[in-house]
Amino acid sequence: MDQENQDDSGTGDLAELRKEIDKLDLRLVDLLNERARVVVRVGAAKQVDGTPVYAPDRESAVLKRICELNGGPLPNRTLQAIYREMMSGSFALERPLQIGYLGPQGSFSHLAAQRKFGSSVEYRPLADIRAVFDEVARCHCDMGMVPIENSSGGGVIDTLDGFLETHVHMCGEVVLEIHHNLLANCTAEEIKAVASKPEVFAQCRQWLATSLPNIEQTPVASSSRAAEMAAQQKGLAAIGSDLAAELYGLKVIFENIEDNSNNMTRFLVIARQPAKRTGNDKTAVMFSTAHRVGALVDVLNVFSRHGINLTNIDSRPSRRRNWEYFFFVDAEGHFEDPNFAEALAEARHHCGELHVLGSFPRATEPI
């Protein structure tokens, strides 16, 4: 009898708590729609002013503010994910955005784009990185998502070349934790071969040698293509993302098979418009140096004298003249900051060419 009373009491408490949640949900829905009505007015004002739908500085300010307001128990990362999805819905109310990315569907570029822009924008898988640059430059896509460097594999050459050959701006960055999973439509014992990109095989080398030592490895152009093949061929597994498993109807046989648990890739958002200052920015600069001894050192010393921290440097052949190189530098600050602008003006005296590729809000943690 006592047990029955306890059960009834517990059920009653749960029922009351659920009623309380239902009331809160009612208020939330009303507030979300009230916010959406204001968003529609914002969209109309942007059309009059010719302001882009997506404003990286505004996104950064909103996400920073909600974290400052957050008293818990929800972690900041959860609140940011909720607000990114709300922003995605806002974009759709103003004007549907089209985001190009390195495809096929289910690629890590696709996953990075979804984490950044949510589920209410349109996504276009493109054949290669150059196509992402071209479609943004031609106004066929509002923005593009391209990988720039991996913590294990280094810089992405095709992305650097894209900046040499097209006129687009960097307006954002995304840091994504890369977790590789073994995907298949069969059991682990039935796997006869594994498909993925060569770079992915390299990132999972130790696990594959230990767990699947005698299984054939089939290199393909992308991890998404591998998932597509695995969905069609029983006995063929793929190494790919959770998103690829969902899109292609595959089972996750083993999770997190990467050798380096701290494996991350940095992606760039590219657009036709530059981003405004936020106070916590990075700037990417591309330059070629004069043909004399010490020219590169002279350029780097300019940034040092102005107290500007360089976070990355890379180089690529210019493709215009043999043995001429373009250097790519990431630096802390915005190109419109007075000190940064002075440094750029001084650096130009030591360069054959110098181009600011864009300033954008810094990604302080993985998305």
PLM regions: where:
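Domain-level signature for soluble enzymes in the chorismate/prephenate branch of the shikimate pathway
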Residues: 1-367
